Amino acid sequence: MNILVINTGSSSLKYQLIDMTNESVLAKGVCDRIGLEHSFLKHTKTGGETVVIEKDLYNHKLAIQEVISALTDEKIGVIKSMSEISAVGHRIVHGGEKFKESAIIDEDVMKAIRDCVELAPLHNPSNIIGIEACKQILPDVPMVAVFDTAFHQTMPRHAYIYALPYEIYEKYKLRKYGFHGTSHKYVAHRAAQMLGKPIESLKLITCHLGNGASICAVKGGKSVDTSMGFTPLQGLCMGTRSGNVDPAVITYLMEKEKMNINDINNFLNKKSGVLGISGVSSDFRDVQDAAEKGDDRAQLALDIFCYGVRKYIGKYIAVLNGVDAVVFTAGIGENNAYIRREVLKDMDFFGIKIDLDKNEVKGKEADISAPDAKVKTLVIPTNEELEIARETLRLVKNL
């Protein structure tokens, strides 16, 4: 069974075609600059070369058509016709409280996704456009929505309710939702396999560290707390996001800097974090280069980030009453030995110790624990597309 996985952005569309008989990627690619000048499709057939096709992609429907053309092309394709696509799995950023797991897309599900637009105004509209475009091109193919928020719907009430008047939660569903759920779920299950233990018996802390970053406490395979909140702005200091700040800072700044709502949103989401502290970049590699050359602000940005991750790990060890493994994933978590080392230094008290040589690993699965560590430390590259494909298969196989 071949499953097409789609991740739609406002001007981009990423895709993978996965053969679920052996969970192998047949082809993958991205349509970029949709609706803009100089749009193109970048397509890679597994084992083949990457091809860039310049094409006027005025909208997402044209982008989907171009994806199907590439997948079925005699030279660069991997299937003979689009009838070989059994189902489509869509990444949806926000499912609100409505979706505790993935769902087959019908009119009711579409309405519920639209209802969540105000919770994710930057992402859900693009996700909806992607679904509608796919339905026009592949009208008879079942489609599944896989939500970034769904994995965290198992959090207990005391973990997700903010200490605001309860009526505000009831009126606006204003609460912690958490994000990166598909990634946290994938690496938690993979960690259980690597440890050779049933996930139901494990306490895990998963660290999704990329330009956006979040930590998750996983008990028995279920999320019990996570660092992101009502939006992805809560929690850790990130590439351009501030993470946790005293809420009073916002009104203070609005008054002092004469900022409006859009200004303060942009300030906290786009100009803060590692970029704001360092004044160098939101890319950790650039910031590390600057720090190594003696840039004090760059070093401070790295220290603040690592300190934040350390605090959440400590916090979640308390929440879980211990931990069996700490897992690092995503761009920084998978590839940055310095960040992993700084995050986990002086954690012997908790039984967490890493082997510095093993820690040099980049972009592949590894157990980097020291031989005498009581707690395992794992590096696991995330695979959100495969997790989306698995969820899609689970729901459509009995149709």
UniProtKB/Swiss-Prot annotation:
Query: Which terms in the Gene Ontology molecular function aspect does this entry carry?
Result: acetate kinase activity; ATP binding; magnesium ion binding
What are the binding positions for Mg(2+) in this chain? 7, 384
List the pathway annotation. Answer: Metabolic intermediate biosynthesis; acetyl-CoA biosynthesis; acetyl-CoA from acetate: step 1/2
Q: Which GO BP annotation is one of this protein's?
A: acetate metabolic process
Q: What superkingdom does the record give?
A: Bacteria
NCBIfam families, from UniProt?
A: ackA (TIGR00016)
Q: What is this protein called?
A: Acetate kinase
Source species of the chain: Acetivibrio thermocellus (strain ATCC 27405 / DSM 1237 / JCM 9322 / NBRC 103400 / NCIMB 10682 / NRRL B-4536 / VPI 7372) (Clostridium thermocellum)
- Write the lineage as a comma-separated list: Bacteria, Bacillati, Bacillota, Clostridia, Eubacteriales
The gene is ackA
